[in-house]
A protein has these predicted regions:
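Non-catalytic helical/linker scaffolds that mediate oligomerization, partner binding
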Residues: 1-473
């Protein structure tokens, strides 16, 4: 069983024919919906299709809503795009104007107040660079330092400048309400800067009936990196969003930051996603570059919970091939990892709480007995996530009583979710879990399993029991 999970972004390419179904059957664990683009009507169609297909194939594919967040974008050009030449003058304005080769509006209405002369402005992931030379009223006058073509609604980054944009815009709130109504499983919080950003979003979700949605903080700028420890504590997972990060932060720092974040998030027992440009050339080509294949493999060696495809599946020419390639790279890389050694090394960083002690003992027992699988019986998913933290070599079977918990566990490293239905007698649950694993071909007679759970069942965060069981007829 592949341990590293795969997130696929849905878009026009996945709307065609049976592409979405093929993504599911090829290894997609989570469907990402990017709310920086597209309409509610189109996103609802995609969510409905995911729901229908996961029911058809009995696959717990989760839905992740990715917010627009406190980002800055260009507005629109009269001719949709313009080409800027190095050395020319160009103006960004917070006034509402029609874009030309000389001026264009931006979405942040107070940008002229936040920015200063000498600031660098990067457009379209840094492909075009401007230097601020003067600020007059609402107009920001710039000199083009790196020319190129820019088009409608391209992203704008301003490294080193703390912007006064609220973390949650009115659009973000509307998007979250839509996500609650559609029963999404995760929200990816774009441009997370502080733990307070996450707390604000959690409060909004709770106030509107979405407290069971898990929040993934996207780290995309230096402020988020500086506050990474408190952000990890506040959220349920981290996305290393290397696109904007690589614009806001020097490129040579990104691999170092990626490895640092992955290590910290694993130690916290939470999910970590490595994202952006992983197989970017497969937007146009049926095979990735060798550098891209190595990039995916290196993230897996680092222990990432999931790798993510963005434009490759949303708008690329080879979406299904991209998922299959990512799955192949993951499966091959995982065969080379010495999980026992990693487990022994990680013991040095163990939190001495009851749950950690039981989960550590569960994994240690599984190694000692050469167990086929670890079975966690869980109401909230907590037990399974804590086992996943230790990255055991055997399968982790996450037996949950709730469909949403099953889908959320489908993002956790190494966890194979199984729905058991409600039952409050612990040994009945264990027997039901064994039978479900036998039914799905995960276990057979004679296999050794290590079972862990919290007793009494239903009290979240109380993993306190370990049981060894040999599968019988």
């Amino acid at each position: 069983m592949r341990k590293t999970k795969i997130i696929c972004t849905l878009g026009p390419a996945t709307d065609k024919g049976d592409v979405l179904e093929q993504l599911m059957l090829s290894g997609m664990n989570v469907a990402r919906l990017n709310f920086s683009h597209d309409t509610y009507e189109n996103q609802k169609k995609r969510i409905d299709k995911v729901k229908a297909l996961r029911k058809k194939h009995n696959l717990p594919v989760a839905c992740l809503l990715d917010t627009k967040g406190p980002e800055i974008r260009l507005k629109t050009f009269k001719d949709e795009k313009v080409t800027l030449e190095m050395g020319q003058d160009f103006c960004l304005t917070t006034r509402d104007v029609e874009g030309t080769k000389d001026i264009v509006s931006v979405t942040h209405k107070d940008l002229h107040k936040d920015i200063h002369v000498g600031s660098n402005i990067l457009i379209d992931d840094g492909l075009v660079g401007l230097k601020v030379v003067a600020i007059k009223g609402q107009d920001i006058h710039c000199k083009v330092e790196n020319g190129g073509t820019i088009s409608n609604r391209k992203g704008v980054n301003i490294p080193g400048v703390e912007l006064s944009i609220p973390f949650m815009s009115e659009k973000d709130k509307e998007d979250l309400l839509f996500g609650i109504k559609q029963d999404v499983d995760f929200v990816a919080a774009s441009f997370t800067r502080t733990a307070d950003d996450i707390k604000e979003m959690k409060a909004f979700l709770k106030a509107n009936g979405g407290e069971d949605i898990r929040i993934i903080a996207k780290i995309e700028n230096s402020q988020g990196v500086d506050n990474i420890d408190s952000i990890i504590e506040a959220c349920e997972g981290i996305m290393v969003a290397r696109g904007d990060m690589g614009v806001e932060i020097p490129e040579e720092e990104v691999p170092i930051i990626q490895k640092m974040i992955i290590k910290k998030v694993i130690a916290a027992g939470k999910v970590v996603i490595t994202a952006t440009q992983m197989l970017d050339s497969m937007m146009k080509n049926p095979r990735p570059t060798r550098a891209e294949a190595t990039d995916v493999a290196n993230a897996i060696y680092d222990g990432t919970s999931a790798t993510m495809l963005s434009g490759e599946t949303a708008a690329g020419a080879y979406p299904v091939e991209a998922v299959k390639m990512m799955a192949r790279i993951a499966e091959r890389t995982e065969k080379e990892i010495n999980y026992r050694k990693r487990f022994n090394d990680m013991a040095k960083y163990t939190d001495p709480g009851i749950t950690d002690a039981i989960c550590h003992a569960t994994c240690s027992t599984a190694y000692d007995l050469d167990a086929k699988a670890i079975i966690t019986v869980t109401k909230s998913g907590f037990s399974a996530r804590m086992i996943s933290k230790y990255r055991p070599g055997c399968d982790i079977i996450g037996c949950a009583m709730d469909e949403k918990v099953c889908r959320q566990l489908n993002l956790s490293w190494g966890v194979r979710p199984i729905l058991l239905g409600e039952e409050w007698e612990v040994f009945v649950l264990f027997e039901r879990a064994i039978n479900a694993c036998k039914r799905d071909g995960l276990l057979e007679k004679g296999d050794v399993t290590v079972i862990t759970s919290g007793v009494p069942i239903g009290r979240s965060g109380t993993t306190n029991m370990l049981k060894v069981q040999v599968v019988d007829d």
